[in-house]
Amino acid sequence: MKPLKLNYFFIGIITLLLALALWPSIPWRSSQDVQLRQILSRGELRISTVNSPLTYAMSNGSPTGLDYELAKRFADYLGVKLVVSSRKNLDELFDDLDGDDADLLAAGLIYNHERLERFRAGPTYYSISQQMVYRLGSPRPKTLDKLQGRLVVTSGSAHAATLRDLKAEKYPQLSWESASDQSTQELLKQVADGKLDYTLGDSVTIGLMQRIHPQLAVAFDLSDEEPVIWYMRRSHDDSLSAALLDFFSQLVEDGTLARLEEKYLGHVGEFDYVDTTTFLSAIDETLPDLRPLFEKYATDIDWKLLAAISYQESHWNPLATSPTGVRGLMMLTRNTAESLNVTDRVDPEQSIRGGAQYMSHMMQKMPDTIPEDEKIWFALASYNMGYAHLLDARKLTEKQKGNPDSWVDVKMRLPMLSQKRYYTQTTYGYARGHEAYNYVENIRRYMVSLEGYLIEKEAKVQQQTQIALGYPAVPLTKVPE
């Protein structure tokens, strides 16, 4: 999969031009601001979305997701309460707009020119490419006229619109089926399971799905980079659109959009089939015995993150030993173990307890100016290459006009610490910054795989239990976008 492209300059320019075009004619706080006035009078911003870790989900009792966080910030910007409705499919989403049951659709939707006849597009907040997907091991098609099997896409989606355009322009013999009751994620899973030959997906969704279904493979791209947007009702009143454009312009300018996209999309780029399949096997074979210990001692971080750190360190091998002498599930040094009262580094419980305590200590060392949800990445980089070198990376970031408290800015400077023209300017000199960069990114990818795999596995168990008891099976929980 090619790396995700987040063109903030392009997004900022387009957003600014649109805002300037709208602002002189209809200021969003004028007497004509009907849509916005209704939201302010109601005291609520109503959004409809779909349930997935990328858009909106509950994690440890709190809502999370890129679209949720953006919507919450927009509601705060307007000074109103956010009300979220989760829907099953595209038809239900757009029905909410038609029926005035939602002000915005915030669901990671691709720009679809067919929808613009009835709905208005909001600003771009990241971009994707549409891709043809097949199952690894099957013949790889090179073009649309080389497909040999069933192609199914979600009805009403941008993928269906793309196929209609391509059929009219170049491939008159092209045929496919549309599924109104299945999401893109569900169709991708069918391809991974060998139940379907082909489907279309966006590069981000595919990249995340490959973390739990490594059998998914990209045959070719069907589009260049396309915008992901929110939708609102089309009307002569531009007040809500103008407010949204102004809001996103501020997010681009102050770096908030870049930080949120790093949080949810920054780990999507690279995919290693062998490493992923090995990790998924370890989840089934090794993790069940260790999970109670991770859950017991992960007091300051998610237990799945602690498990991902341990896998990166030792591949969950309690007897792991490195040439430098670090040992155990968390690969503790002798000095670190002694400071944490760990008497036996190869004892699983002692190692996990010590590792959790050490990570908590490292996070506490991070400056308060760093956002809470980013401190863990700084702490992990510090753990890998040393706190002093992390200080150098932050100073280098600031010197280059970046934000030393933003992980998206600092992580790009880590590899520079091994380049002479940069490390000669630092206080503590040369560091294997590229290793720290890869270390953190690997842990983030393991975390995504673990979360998605467990969600899907637990949903299957629930469904099988219901069938065994004679109850109708509920639909499986959607896997990560």
UniProtKB/Swiss-Prot annotation:
Membrane protein topology class: Peripheral membrane protein
Region (Non-LT domain): 22-268
SUPFAM superfamilies: Lysozyme-like, Periplasmic binding protein-like II
Active site: 313
Keyword DNA-binding: no
Cellular component aspect of the GO annotation: cell outer membrane
Pfam families attached to this UniProt entry: SBP_bac_3, SLT
Signal peptide: 1-21
Principal localisation: membrane
Known catalytic reactions: Exolytic cleavage of the (1->4)-beta-glycosidic linkage between N-acetylmuramic acid (MurNAc) and N-acetylglucosamine (GlcNAc) residues in peptidoglycan, from either the reducing or the non-reducing ends of the peptidoglycan chains, with concomitant formation of a 1,6-anhydrobond in the MurNAc residue
EC number: 4.2.2.n1
Keyword terms: Cell outer membrane, Cell wall biogenesis/degradation, Lyase, Membrane, Signal
GO MF term (any one): peptidoglycan lytic transglycosylase activity
Family of this protein: In the N-terminal section; belongs to the bacterial solute-binding protein 3 family.
Protein name: Membrane-bound lytic murein transglycosylase F
Organism: Pectobacterium atrosepticum (strain SCRI 1043 / ATCC BAA-672)
The organism's taxonomic lineage, starting at the top: Bacteria, Pseudomonadati, Pseudomonadota, Gammaproteobacteria, Enterobacterales
